[in-house]
C-alpha cells in the first residue's frame, strides 16, 4: 500500500521494515513521510514508537534512563595530552550508545578523539524488558552476527554489495556531527566503590604505551558512543536451566584476534573489502544473521539499528575496532564477540564488507593486545568463582577504542541489589580512568592519534569491584531492627522513579541468570526469615512450658488445700450424731422438770425436817449445818404453831390436805399481821426478822419467800 506511493523511498522503507518488524507498515510509511525519507530521523522516531508495539505501553526516555544502571568508564587512549577534546568522540564515528539491557545505566562515553574508552557497565543479570531510550534501539533487530538466535531475521539476507540508497552520505564522512542527543542528562547519584586497575609492570619500554592514569570526575552527557568501542561483559555464572537468548551466538563465536581498523580515512584492509559471508572461519557457527542484510546501523551518524548489544562501528573517516564481549556462561570460556568490523572504501563507493573473524586477516603491524581481567569481588560467606572475561589476544590498532565491561556480580552471589537494602546495591559511581599516551615532539595535536609502525603492546588491566557487604549481614541487622521488607525483582533498580509500570515487563522477559539470582536472593531472604521465625517459635515454646509449669504448681497447691480441708478434725457432725445429742438433751430436760415437780410437792407438805428423815443427808453433799437462831418465846411459839399447821402427813388423803393447807395459810397471815404490828416502831421490826434458809443457811430478807441462793422455799 505505502510502497506504491511515489513519495516513499522503497529502499528506506524496506530497511526500516527490516529493523522495526513490530511496527506496522502504515506507521513506518507515515513516519517516512513526516521525515522526508530521512533514514536517520525515521530510525529515531520509530525507536521511540517501538515500545508501544513491543509492550503495549510507552515508556518515556526518562523512565528508561532511570531504570538503567550506572557506568564506569575507563578510557585507554594513545594520543597527545593536548589533543584531548571532550567533544571529538562523537564526531569520529557517530557511534550509538550501547544499551546492554533495560537495567543498564546510561552509557555516556567520553567525546575523546584519540582515546581508548573502557566503560565498565555494572548491570544485573536481566534481559531487556523495557525498550531503550536511544533513538536507535530495536530489540528485535540485531546486526548480522550480533543478532541473537532467538530473533531470526525478518527477511532473507541480502548481499553486502553496497550501502542502502537511502543512507545519509554524511554517515561516511569522518568528522560529521552526530544527531542531537535526547533530552536526558547523566545523573551521578550512586555512591562510589573503588575499582582496582592494575597495569602490568613488564610493558615494553620502547613502545609508546600509556604511562599516566587520569581520573575524570564527570562525563559529558552524550548519547552517542565515542569513536571505536570494545564492549566486554563479564562472564556470569548464570543458571544452566534458562540461558538468555543472546548466549547462543556468543558461545558460538570462537576465540581469537579481532580485525580492527586503523585511524586513517582510507581503507585499511583493501583485500577484505569485498568479503563475502562464506569467508567466515569454519569455527564460527553459521547463524542466519551472518549475511549482510542492511548497512550496519552504526555506519551512520545516527545509530538507527538497535541491536540490544550493538557494537559502535566507526565512520569512514575514523574507523575503529569494535570488539564485543558478551556474557558467556561459566561453562564456556569467554569469547570475543566478533562484530564484523565493516571496512569502508572511499566515500564515493559506499561499499561495505565484513571482515572474517580470523587472525590471518589482521595486519600484524597494527595490533595491540589489551588484556582486561575483571577480578571477582570475594564476599564473606560466599565462594564466588567468576570466570574472568579478559580480552585475550585482542589486537587493536592505535586508535580510539571504547571498552564497555559489565562488572556484573554472578548470579550465585547473594549480595544482589535488593530495594529493601538501605544502600544502593550496585554501589559503583561513574569513575572515568583515562590512560593518556605521552607522545614525542613529532606528534602534533590532532583528533586522530599517530599511527605507530610495529606496536605489539600488551595492556593488562585488572578491574575489580570492591567487596560489598554480604546480604547475610544485612539480614542479621534486619533481625535486630524490624521485619524485612518484601523482596522486589532484581530488574527493578532502587531509586528509579519510573519503574512502577514497567518492572513487571522486566521480570517477565528477564534472563535465566536474573531469575536464578533473584531466586537465590529470595531463598536467602526466606531462609533468614525462617530462622527468625524459628527463634520466635522457640521463645514461644519456652513461654508455654513455663506457663504449664505454673499451672501444674497451682493445681498441686489447690489439691493440697482440698486434702487438708477434708482431713480436718473439726468435721461437721453426722445426722446420726446430731440425733443422738438431741435425744440426750431432751432426756436431761425431762429429768430437770421431774426434779422441780418433786421439790414443789415436798414443799406443799409443810416444813421439811431433815431429822425426821433418816436418809435425808445421804442424797446431798455433806456440808456445815447451821443451827437455828434462838428466837423469843412468842416467836418460837408461833413458829411451832406454824410448823404444826403446815405439817403434812404423807398418809393423809387429799381433802384433808386441802383443809390443812387452808388452815396453814390463815395462820400464816395472822402471824404476819401480828409480827408487823409488833415491829412497827422499828423498820426491822416492821419488816420482820431475816430468816435463815434451811437448805443453804443463807440469811434472807423477811419479804422473800424463797432463798436468794438456792431458791428453796422459806417454809418447808
From Swiss-Prot:
- What positions are modified (Phosphothreonine)? 408
N-acetylalanine modifications at = 2
* GO function terms (MF aspect): K63-linked polyubiquitin modification-dependent protein binding; molecular adaptor activity; ubiquitin binding; zinc ion binding
Cystine bridges: which residues? none
Q: Which UniProt keywords apply?
A: Acetylation, Coiled coil, Metal-binding, Phosphoprotein, Ubl conjugation, Zinc, Zinc-finger
The residues covered by the CUE domain are 8-51
Superkingdom classification of source: Eukaryota
Q: Where does the record place the region Disordered?
A: 141-189, 227-349, 373-433, 479-513
Q: What is annotated about its quaternary structure and interactions?
A: Interacts with TAB1, TAB2, MAP3K7, TRAF2 and TRAF6. The minimal TAB3-containing complex (TAB1-MAP3K7-TAB3) appears not to contain TAB2. However, it seems sensible to consider that TAB2 may also join this complex and may act in a cooperative manner with TAB3. Interacts with DYNC2I2 (via the WD domains). Interacts with RBCK1. Binds 'Lys-63'-linked polyubiquitin chains. Interacts with TRIM5. Interacts with TRIM38 (via B30.2/SPRY domain), leading to its translocation to lysosomes and degradation. Interacts with ASB1.
> In its UniProt entry, what is this protein called?
TGF-beta-activated kinase 1 and MAP3K7-binding protein 3
Organism, scientific name: Mus musculus
Tell me the organism's taxonomic lineage. Eukaryota, Metazoa, Chordata, Craniata, Vertebrata
